[in-house]
């Protein structure tokens, strides 16, 4: 009412003084209201916040009255407190982000992951606070959760854009894809405390589609090469052990090799890492890794065949053959149980075929040595059901 009276007649000096006083009071009130709004993101000031929001609503109501009243002559209206609320929300978010700890590590990969982790933590913490302590004080049309979320999201966009201006190594590429596909959308936006409060459809994707495709292609190529390198190193070490001619290690009184364990751990590790990014990328990577297992099996067979040809009189030939046949069984068990998807059937068949051929190489040498002293004159049917059954029994006895 005082404001209305001041602006009814502005000709005399008294009214000018009154207007100054009124505007001065409004400025004090405005500063107090938006100080509360700004601090509310990190403080428990619900009573003050309730009063501040009510003050904004009152000003919006008075703005609308002045707009609808053609007789109203108030140049101070509209006061635009609602617009200032939006800018204050952004300012409060910006201030919160300035409080993030500075990275002190010299490791670029650690720096990238830590910077995103810090952003994610403050996003989840602050949005949870907004849901639990601020949202109920605002009318629905303020859309308070999405308003705050948009500004945090802009910070993510800016940070991601800055990061991708530089060439990323394999670890950074992996982490960035994990963040874009999994951590941010699932662990943060879909966190139970935030579920239903943030409209994800209104949040722009953190990376352009083409950049995502490029990073995914780089990641897949790198992962395939990494797994290929490690499984072949394992095979090379195993082949060196054969040629040295030492007795294989025993586990529970049985000859034992770690080859299948090392190889399958590397294969599963590649699949597991892809799952940390997305199921879609896993489905893309898994057939490529399966193809590398097939190539591994071919090389395994070739090296084993070469070993048998060069070491026919080696002291521990039999135990080495036995551990490799057992190793093949473990590989075949794995592909039988895990390569059941349609896209893996061809690799499953190829893998089993190669492994069976490798086993037969071992069976042949074992049978030749076994029956040599018996002076068997007629040609043996090495691959008959009877012989296979006999070989299985012999192998299980070691």
Task: Describe the residue ranges of each PLM region.
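Extended alpha-helical rod/solenoid/coiled-coil scaffold segments used as assembly/tethering elements
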Residues: 210-398
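Extended, noncatalytic alpha-helical scaffold/tether regions
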Residues: 1-244
């Amino acid at each position: 009412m005082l404001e209305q009276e001041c602006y009814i007649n502005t000709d005399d000096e008294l009214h000018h003084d009154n207007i100054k006083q009124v505007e001065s009071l409004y400025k004090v009130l405005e500063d107090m209201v938006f100080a509360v709004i700004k601090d509310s993101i990190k403080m428990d000031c619900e009573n003050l916040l309730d009063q501040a929001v009510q003050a904004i609503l009152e000003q919006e109501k008075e703005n609308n009255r002045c707009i609808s009243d053609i007789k109203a002559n108030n140049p101070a209206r509209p006061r635009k407190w609602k617009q200032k609320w939006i800018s204050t929300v952004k300012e409060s978010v910006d201030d919160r982000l300035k409080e993030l700890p500075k990275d002190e590590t010299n490791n670029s990969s650690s720096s990238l992951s830590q910077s995103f982790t810090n952003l994610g933590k403050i996003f989840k913490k602050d949005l949870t606070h907004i849901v639990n302590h601020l949202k109920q004080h605002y009318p629905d049309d303020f859309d308070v959760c999405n308003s705050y979320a948009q500004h945090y999201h802009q910070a993510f966009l800016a940070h991601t854009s800055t990061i991708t201006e530089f060439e990323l190594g394999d670890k950074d590429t992996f982490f960035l894809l994990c963040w874009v596909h999994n951590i941010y959308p699932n662990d943060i936006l879909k966190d139970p405390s935030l579920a239903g409060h943030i409209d994800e459809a209104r949040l722009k994707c953190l990376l352009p589609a083409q950049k995502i495709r490029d990073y995914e292609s780089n990641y897949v190529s790198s992962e395939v090469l990494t797994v290929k390198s490690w499984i072949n190193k394992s095979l090379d070490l195993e082949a060196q052990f054969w040629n040295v001619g030492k007795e294989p290690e025993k586990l529970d009184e049985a000859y034992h090799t770690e080859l299948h364990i090392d190889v399958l751990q590397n294969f599963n590790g590649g699949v597991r890492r892809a799952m940390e990014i997305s199921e879609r990328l896993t489905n893309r990577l898994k057939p490529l890794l399966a193809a590398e297992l097939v190539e591994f099996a071919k090389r395994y067979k070739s090296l084993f065949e070469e070993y048998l040809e060069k070491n026919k009189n080696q002291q521990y030939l039999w135990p080495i053959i036995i551990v490799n046949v057992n190793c093949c069984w473990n590989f075949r068990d794995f592909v039988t149980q895990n390569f059941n998807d349609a896209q893996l059937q061809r690799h499953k068949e190829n893998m089993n075929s190669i492994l069976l051929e490798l086993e037969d190489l071992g069976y042949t040498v074992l049978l030749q040595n076994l029956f040599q002293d018996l002076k068997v004159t007629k040609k043996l049917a090495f691959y008959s059901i009877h012989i296979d059954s006999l070989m299985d029994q012999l192998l299980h006895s070691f």
